[in-house]
Amino acid sequence: MILVEHATVITVDGERRVFADGSVLVDGSRILQVGPSREVHPPREPDRVIDGSRLVVTPGFVDTHVHLSEHLNRGLLLDDIPVDRYLPDWLIPLYAVMTAEDEQHAALLAGIEMIRTGTTTFCEAGTLFDTSAVADAVERLGMRAILGRWTWDLESGPDRMRQTTAEALAANAAMLEDLGARDGLVRGWPLLLGFGTCSEELIRGAKALADRHGVGWGMMHLASHPSRRTRDRLPLATLDAWGVLAPNAKLSHMVYLDDADIARLVRRGVKISHCPTAGLKHTKGLAAHARVPEMVRDGVCVSLGGDSGNGSNHFDMLRMMYLVANIYKDARLDVRVLPPETVVEMATIRGAEALLMEREIGSLEVGKRADLVLFDRDAPEWRPLLNPLNNLVYAATGSSVRSVMIDGRLVLDEGRITTVDERAVYDRVEVLARDQVRRAGLTVLNRWPLRP
């Protein structure tokens, strides 16, 4: 039993309660009590008491769209690579030579970054090959995750990526059986690549597979960039006609939408993963075209995604929240658009809802899983603490995260990762990254030459 007492607690519960002097009592993997400190009474002596008088406590953040494997080559791609050359010239060669060890260490690196910045649950975008090996790495970290394998039915490209429709569906079925048998924090979903790479049969089959296993399914790239409208803007009306739009569907990016599209998302209960950092860097036209405020206004579940090591280049949810809270205010010339309270919901309870976990995570409530983030108030961005939500969204970054609890376990304790040897991961990543680039036949580019 762990008691965090006398903290500023942002619950994101049904009443959106915030306590200036609050406590959270954790018993095993679940929250036993949460409320004003004067009302939280442990039934026995806690195993540990954490003084929260200089802490801010929030629910763990939920990142609904991450490419784990690309963390191994973070920073490799310069920011002036044309969007239509990004995948074929750079990512495909890297993925073609990706080993299980590469994927594991990329996952460890990405996971450490997420933990250190307050993310406790994530959904991989669907770009893994050895999902079992990656699941082992995620379990070592102690994170909650949904994983997906590389899924399309193209018969061109590198040998390991060629898949018929039947092969793609069979591989996903095997993954769901494997991860489902683990009965732990890691689960699997069918997650399709997008980019016009998936047939109707594959999309229908993925949805049927998800329904059969009682999980969600998703498409990685949809309506994401103006230059790809003819390739990846599969009309939502078509997906609807195929019967695949449903509450267990999660679509990513979704920049180019009209009113009819939004109405269809509302009607079908489809979930959206919005990736602000990658969207801006890849010039997707967020400020000019994205309908995020309108989706939120009309009741679409919109969550946040960090995307990739060369897309956003980081997985700091606080930086994503800051962008979302500001981009659309300026775009609409309206300071009332997406207030900090709404953005915090997007990073917590809406993320949980997008991953079909809202009954288990996303808020600090009795009976829910104990996923908590403890921020250190002794940092300049937290002072003075007049409005905790304003400080959280507009001032803080992940650097002030002090401790993180996932499923009742402190995976970050007073600034120290407790589950893996952090330095050993960093050292091995340096070796693997350079070897992967060499095997892919790519060149590391630096506009300012990196001299010996």
Where are these regions (language model features)?
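Active-site microenvironment of metallo-dependent hydrolases
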Residues: 1-22, 26-32, 37, 43, ...
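Active-site gating loops and adjacent loop-to-helix segments of metal-dependent hydrolytic enzymes
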Residues: 72-104, 149-166, 226-248, 268-271, ...
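Metal-coordinating catalytic core of metallo-dependent amide/deamination hydrolases
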Residues: 134-262
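His/Asp/Glu-enriched, well-ordered alpha-helical/loop segment
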Residues: 241-248, 293-382, 395
